[in-house]
């Protein structure tokens, strides 16, 4: 994950001090890209321990179209708690947009099912895209989508994906986002009988919060370790039938975790 540490250093060296919605303050750059060859290992940050349970369960939750944190709580995942209302609802966030984007005539579009069909039946299409940025429903969401738009690409029997992330918390959020989308590419590839290719991450407002600086410097002082390997133990009947126990990360030997406050 050398690219990730290089990004941290770039933000520290070149970032502009900016105010933000949370009132915390950031160092920010605009426009950055990283590419991860998924055949070379699973891109999980090793300079601090990442909470795999949260990463996997959150993705499974998205794929079910769920927008209430009850499922997450049942599985000891609390990463969405700060934004949920008293009933655990988040409004029409990622899961709703991925699986049931509303149309003006009252129908709903399952973008994930559509993408799966395209990958199987028209893999050379340049329209294999999922968007969570529904302008008509942004004001109903507890949090506007940060990872907003992603596109799949098939070449030489390999599946690649590029994500555009309009806002990126480099220290806390980005390691989760990279691992989550890498996991999704592996799952999609298995369902479509493809190998994995590259995951390309593109960031818009890419920032370090002012109250993450001590943690950031600690992380930069650590030497990256070898990337782990993702093992998917079975091939379910559909993308929507994966379970937490289907995934195993082999050889993950990270440095200790580093706690930092979440900007809300």
Swiss-Prot record:
MF-aspect GO terms: thymidylate synthase activity
Chain residues that bind (6R)-5,10-methylene-5,6,7,8-tetrahydrofolate: 51, 169, 263
Presence of keyword Methyltransferase: yes
Matching InterPro entries: Thymidate_synth/dCMP_Mease, Thymidate_synth/dCMP_Mease_dom, Thymidate_synth/dCMP_Mease_sf, Thymidylate_synthase, Thymidylate_synthase_AS
Record-linked Gene3D superfamilies: Thymidylate synthase/dCMP hydroxymethylase domain
GO biological process: dTMP biosynthetic process; dTTP biosynthetic process; methylation
One Pfam family it belongs to: Thymidylat_synt
Active-site residues (renumbered): 146
Recorded catalytic activity of this chain's protein: dUMP + (6R)-5,10-methylene-5,6,7,8-tetrahydrofolate = 7,8-dihydrofolate + dTMP
Enzymatic class: transferase
Binding sites annotated in the UniProt record for dUMP: 21, 126-127, 166-169, 177, 207-209
Compartments, record wording: Cytoplasm
General function of this protein: Catalyzes the reductive methylation of 2'-deoxyuridine-5'-monophosphate (dUMP) to 2'-deoxythymidine-5'-monophosphate (dTMP) while utilizing 5,10-methylenetetrahydrofolate (mTHF) as the methyl donor and reductant in the reaction, yielding dihydrofolate (DHF) as a by-product. This enzymatic reaction provides an intracellular de novo source of dTMP, an essential precursor for DNA biosynthesis.
Subunit field text: Homodimer.
Family: Belongs to the thymidylate synthase family. Bacterial-type ThyA subfamily.
Name this protein carries in UniProt: Thymidylate synthase
Lineage: Bacteria, Pseudomonadati, Pseudomonadota, Gammaproteobacteria, Enterobacterales
Record gene name: thyA
